[in-house]
Amino acid sequence: MPSLSQPFRLATLPKIASLSNFSLQADYVQVADGTFNESTNNITLGISGSSISQYIINPTPKLTFDYPIPSTNIITACNAEKGQANIDGNIEASTDDEANNEKTINTQKKRNVEIWAFGLMVNKGNYTLNVITKALEDTTDTSNDHLSESDIDNKAYTGSDEFLSQYKIKAKAKVMSIKIDTKNSLVIAILQNGLIEIFDFKLTLLHSFDISYDNLKYAKWFTENGTEYVFVLCPLQDDKVCYKLLELTDCGSGESSPIKELSSTIIEGFSFENSKLCYQFGKLYKLNQGKIYIYSLPHCQLQQVIEFPMVDKLSPGDDLISFQPVSVNRVLLTVNNVIYLLDLLHCSTLSQRELTHVKTFQLLKSAVINSEKSHNSKTIAIGISTKNGPNPTSSLEIINIDVGTNTLKDSLGKSFQVGNNDSSVILKPLFDDKDINDKRVKCNDVSGDSSVPVLHCNEVIEKLSALQDNDITSFDDIFFKELKIKEEHYTEKDRYISDPGFLNKVLDLIFGKFSGNDYPKTLTFLLTHPLFPLSRTRNLLSLLRDQPRLFKQAIVTCPNLPLNELLEELFSIRNRELLLDISFRILQDFTRDSIKQEMKKLSKLDVQNFIEFITSGGEDSSPECFNPSQSTQLFQLLSLVLDSIGLFSLEGALLENLTLYIDKQVEIAERNTELWNLIDTKGFQHGFASSTFDNGTSQKRALPTYTMEYLDI
């Protein structure tokens, strides 16, 4: 179930000049992307004017490592990654000559390290890029008493050393984004002047790529099918922005640049200033003036605009807003001290929490998870909280998040969209003007001559009671004509029939006047009514068992059917179609725990008969008779049956059939997975291959000229 926990404190921010402006704290505290995920226990942050710090979360939040920086330095970008790197070192080794001289030998040793890279701004126009190599705490070196030139263990670097290496260079412009590639030992810095520079871990410049714009404001790296991509946004005049998509290719391709431009587009009406941006799973989200604009990649086309009622009346400068993604179509939004978990697909507020102990809470970073492809629905986010009072203090706090199941079920009844007040006060007419007659009551408050029907319950009951037994035709004529019902099943136009007492009396007359051989069409209508009386659902299935059409209708549409009766019918029926209907109804209406508890009360013989029917491979029950969705449905129900009774209660022959059935299901799942991966790979290649891959040409071939597109938004 979607939920937001109460945040807990990680550390208190220092009271320094660079952090005195609370509205800019989120820009002056940078969180390293590389090591921040839903299961991390280490968080690396760059705190402007203070230090590059590393904290652990469990069992008790505390500072584990700290690299101080001058109080006048502002951190513009920060990242960290764990991996292996070649560490240089010098040792003194004796030679075999007569003078017994010593010479210095340069050595390299590959070690498990942590790479920290960050950009600093000392003052406007003075920028630096820094790389620190830090030994992991569990890294140890094997000692060797006998040193040789071919196999020398450098004793100078041990697990207790603070840093293995430190490098610093002057940057040509403000560092906006940093990516660390531990596989190829690279640091990729994206600068505000439009340069993308690639360094090794010693900050030796290897490649440089110019995007031709000197006002880069946003850059985001993402991975698709093992390939790294980055898109950048450069604001232009007249609310225009330049969008560029680039690919990071194999860095070992020689002298050619590993950065390749895939597309470039000028987007009009983007309004970059005062906007909050975030990206997840192929979509770019922009929050501006109470509206969120959703752009789809790779062409950055506007897909949807959603209005947020919780932020549309805010005064700029008075309230602090932050915005971060957490899962597919789900984002976190904070307005002052209120946190919202939003579903942008169904426009709903899944959960919200007001932090009464603080004045504001600003999100810094969230760990994005794909809850559609994994069973994990829990993640974390880190932010800055500021307390009330004359001397407010700010703290780093972590919040635990449950994003839910990513289905419509999470959003039912939680929409944040506000309807029109005029249309919500007065009900709209259910019927056209031509249906108005003397038995309708005019609604003068509604524009036109709209009306709603009047329900004369007592008159209808009296007329139905006066009929003779088994007079099906007269019963249906009175019921449908008196109530102005046009269909034999419930529709939205029948909403005015909402009296449970009236429905109960009609059912009493039906079961009292008609035998079990045949029933009027009125019963079909009532079985589709969402207000079917709860008291009448008991023993309803057994009463309708001899009427196949009504029996199936009750299973599919009648609300509030008891679970125990559904299970009894499920374990006694030998019809494939009804078996699927009942199983779908059970899985849809009841929880797994309640199903298992009720199964334990049933006879083991009935349960075994059900398992035998499913796994025996007969004409009506073999896996080949079901489509993939039906087979998955029965497989899920079968797992609940096995959980409730246990495998030890089954006999040998039944276990063999069950094993064969499960093997077939696993084989189908493996085959479907392979096909899905093939389709997914081919689909992605068709999306990007036109400008990225060319199997018939060399990697050194020049890129085709890109096109400029102007979009009217």
Swiss-Prot record:
Alphabetized Pfam families for the sequence: Utp8_b_propeller, Utp8_C
Predominant cellular place of this UniProt entry's protein: nucleus
Location of Phosphoserine modifications: 148, 150
TM ranges: none
Any one Gene Ontology BP term: maturation of SSU-rRNA
Subcellular localization: Nucleus, Nucleolus
Phosphothreonine modifications at: 95
Taxonomy, superkingdom: Eukaryota
Key words, A-Z: Nucleus, Phosphoprotein, Ribonucleoprotein, Ribosome biogenesis, rRNA processing, Transcription
A cellular component annotation (GO) from this entry: small-subunit processome
GO molecular function: tRNA binding; U3 snoRNA binding
Subunit-level organization: Interacts with snoRNA U3. Interacts with MPP10 and UTP25. Component of the ribosomal small subunit (SSU) processome composed of at least 40 protein subunits and snoRNA U3. In the absence of snoRNA3, forms a complex with other t-UTPs. This complex can associate with pre-18S ribosomal RNAs.
Physiological role: Involved in nucleolar processing of pre-18S ribosomal RNA. Also has a role in nuclear tRNA export. It acts between the steps of tRNA maturation/aminoacylation and its subsequent translocation out of the nucleus. Required for optimal pre-ribosomal RNA transcription by RNA polymerase I together with a subset of U3 proteins required for transcription (t-UTPs).
Misc: Present with 16800 molecules/cell in log phase SD medium.
Name of the protein in question: U3 small nucleolar RNA-associated protein 8
